[in-house]
Amino acid sequence: CAADLGVAVLHAQPPTPDSDPLDRARRQGLTALFVATPGLTGPVVIKHALSGNCDASHIMDTLSSVESAMSQLASPRDVERLDDVSDDQEKSVHRVGTERRFAPNSMRARAKTTRSLPSKSHVIGDSFLGPLIEAAVHRLDLEADSAHTLDGVDAMIHGQILYTLGQCVRHTQNTHEGPLFAQTVLEFASGSFFADSAHPHIRRAAFVTAGLVATSLTAIPVAMAYADRTPLSLALETFTTRASERHRADYDADVRAAAAFALSALAECKLRASDAVDRLPDDPIDHGTPQITTRIAHAPITL
């Protein structure tokens, strides 16, 4: 099946010492499988790669392929409309009898836009983000149980996991589950293992991920989160506090720079939310018309 094929492609080994061509082919093959059957291959291959039975190169290839697949799935795809009435299509259709067309001007205007641009970003959460967090938690538990000493390779892997999670949120920002995914990734990255890690590479990755999440959030969900004090607003405030502390006191210059990036992105996110609230009408009901407008309570948002 597709999942077994994905695992087999992941473990393909080069017949010669020159492994670069096969490495590229492996990543391209995994990306193609993730795009074609994300729900079948994504969870299985991610779980296998982070189970402890694969080396660092296999894990990095898997995460790189996941990122490439998400980029393709979230990109708009050109799909011809079924009701296209352009001139080219009319020439290939032989009509019998007399056709009556109502609202010809509207139909003619609609025919000018002959393509729609859907995407498959809605499958990213179940296919990649959820399995990746679950596999990462399992890997952390295995390392804790075995008293594993964190080295540079482990820090690189954990940092890439966080960055891939940030890309998951970025590619799902226009889905209705985007704010929930952002909250989940922020809560995961703000854990003490990442944000307070002894390894600076992991701390830096945590704050870069927070910045990616903050730049991906749209204004209205953030405004609603601050108005209702939902877990998303609490996660944003928690990361703002952590980033402020690390920006002031961390000994690593790269971590301080990453914390500054996170602070700037979080402040921009709050500012967009505040502007969105200010642009909404004060009265939820316009008595001059029968329409009802949406209103969000004007909760104070401190920057």
Stretch-by-stretch model annotation:
Residues 2-84:
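Helix-rich alpha-solenoid scaffolding regions
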Residues 53-55, 59, 69, 78-303:
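Long alpha-helical repeat scaffolds
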